[in-house]
Design a protein with these regions (language model features):
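Bacterial N-terminal signal peptides
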Residues: 2-11
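Extracytoplasmic copper-binding redox domains, predominantly the cupredoxin/blue-copper superfamily
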Residues: 16-131
Length: 131
């Protein structure tokens, strides 16, 4: 392998190593009917993975708040969300143990609110902070 090939391979390896997986649990506390994302605030970079996992209280979903999003940010989030059920919305996660992965797209630094549609009335919400 030539020098250029080694440099390119090193760059790819460094980028892959820099990717962080953030695990977010979607859960319910049956004692007080509290629904939540845990953690509820995630600080990430473009390329990181958000792994949402239903622990209890299904069904759940992940919906990014459209209010205040630029058209570019909205398009980037929609493109990053596989199997969307609607604009900025994951499919419904109907069983405990279900997972949903989002690779953080190139977004401007800032805060991006999200919530669980079935439990929005219970204030099940979170925030993605882009560095």
């Amino acid at each position: 392998m030539g020098l250029l090939g080694m440099v390119l391979l090193a760059g790819i390896s460094a980028a892959a190593a820099a990717q962080e997986v953030h695990q977010i649990r979607l859960q319910m506390n049956a004692r007080n009917d509290e629904y939540r994302f845990s953690p509820s605030t995630i600080t990430a970079r473009p390329g990181d993975v958000l792994l949402f996992r239903t622990v209890s209280g299904a069904p759940h979903s992940v919906v990014f708040e459209p209010k205040g999003l630029s058209p570019r940010a909205r398009d980037a989030l929609n493109s990053a969300m596989p199997r969307r059920s609607a604009d900025l919305s994951s499919p419904l996660l109907t069983e405990d143990g279900a997972e949903y992965r989002v690779v953080v797209p190139p977004l401007p630094a800032g805060a991006y609110a999200f919530y669980c549609l079935p439990h929005r009335a219970y204030d099940m919400r979170g925030e993605l902070r882009i560095r």
